[in-house]
Amino acid sequence: QNWPRPQIPP
């Protein structure tokens, strides 16, 4: 299963 990765701030 492919789920979107959590958005990590730069």
Swiss-Prot record:
Secreted recorded as keyword: yes
Subcellular location: Secreted
GO terms for biological process, alphabetical: regulation of blood pressure
GO cellular component: extracellular region
Tissue-specific expression: Expressed by the venom gland.
Gene Ontology MF term list: peptidase inhibitor activity; toxin activity
Keywords from the UniProt entry: Hypotensive agent, Metalloenzyme inhibitor, Metalloprotease inhibitor, Protease inhibitor, Pyrrolidone carboxylic acid, Secreted, Toxin
Residue positions where Pyrrolidone carboxylic acid is found in the record: Q1
Functional summary from the UniProt entry: This peptide both inhibits the activity of the angiotensin-converting enzyme (ACE) and enhances the action of bradykinin by inhibiting the peptidases that inactivate it. It acts as an indirect hypotensive agent. Bradykinin-potentiating peptide 10b-F has much lower activity than the full-length peptide.
Further comment: Bradykinin-potentiating peptide 10b-F is present only in female snakes.
Family: Belongs to the bradykinin-potentiating peptide family.
UniProt-recorded name of the protein: Bradykinin-potentiating peptide 10b
Organism: Bothrops jararaca
Organism lineage: Eukaryota, Metazoa, Chordata, Craniata, Vertebrata
